[in-house]
Amino acid sequence: MKKIFFFLTIITTINCFGQGNQRKSPHDTVSATNVSVTYGRPYKNGREIFGTLEKFDQVWRLGADEATTITFDKDVKFGDNNVKAGTYAMFAIPDENKWTIILNGVTKQWGAFSYDKNKDKDVAKIKVPVKKLDNIVEQLTISFNAAQAMVIEWDKTQVIVPLNF
């Protein structure tokens, strides 16, 4: 009887501590020809995002956790800026009508907390217009369209960043 009880205890314990269905990681890497972006993908979760959670006119890591990184496999025209192939931290300064997108040479940054001490390492900055969406995008999404422009969407906000290889 003790052996059966011991065996049932072990089975129950293993079952209790086993891994359940894990949701998709909140981190993602998206790629297109010659470019990839690695970023944390936070959820809206009923919050007001731009202007409240992510303050206007303040540097944002463009995701969650570590600073978002973008890797170019070849030289690129980032707005009007010529950028060499390589990996860069990518930040945004959201505003109601336009965003500033920043490429910075220091890739290992936690969020935007150390951006101020590294802003002298900025490689490129461009301003892009904001488009208001009709539908809510629940999870921050970065993708590439057919023209290889980078599309950033979250909540009811979309910005398109031009890239030319």
Question: Which residues are covered by each model-predicted region?
Answer:
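Bacterial Sec-dependent N-terminal signal peptides
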Residues: M1-Q22
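Targeting-peptide/extracellular-domain and disordered-appendage signature
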Residues: Q19-K84, A89-F165
